[in-house]
């Protein structure tokens, strides 16, 4: 549940999160079924490149979290605290004159 919420709410790296989430599910299946050797070398390089690009975009918790559940839960909770929901943002009082003029007050 936390993984899905993280993907929905993390707007800056949403695409990277989804890509890495799907990749991690694929890797989970590979690791647990022992079928790593059935993947052609070219595909293995593509998977590695996809993982690296997603990790570099700041969405590494999905890969770690789908395999190590507690790790992803803690990262997701931290993400909520750093990125408040739309309701929480709308309740913030404008502090500057510019913000008040934009808000129409």
Swiss-Prot record:
UniProt subcellular location: Membrane
Keyword Transmembrane helix assigned: yes
Chain segments annotated as transmembrane: 20-40, 45-65
Listed GO CC annotations: membrane
Source species, domain of life: Eukaryota
Keywords: Membrane, Transmembrane, Transmembrane helix
Main location: membrane
Membrane disposition: Multi-pass membrane protein
Misc note: Almost completely overlaps CAC2.
Protein name: Putative uncharacterized protein YML101C-A
């Amino acid at each position: 549940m936390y993984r899905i919420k993280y993907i929905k709410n993390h707007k800056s790296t949403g695409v990277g999160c989804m890509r890495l989430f799907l990749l991690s599910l694929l890797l989970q299946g590979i690791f647990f079924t022992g079928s790593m050797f059935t993947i052609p070398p070219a595909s293995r390089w593509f998977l590695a490149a996809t993982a690296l690009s997603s990790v570099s975009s700041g969405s590494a918790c999905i890969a770690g979290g789908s395999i190590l559940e507690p790790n992803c839960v803690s990262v997701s909770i931290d993400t909520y605290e750093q990125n408040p929901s739309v309701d929480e943002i709308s309740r913030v009082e404008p502090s500057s004159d510019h913000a008040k003029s934009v808000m129409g007050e």
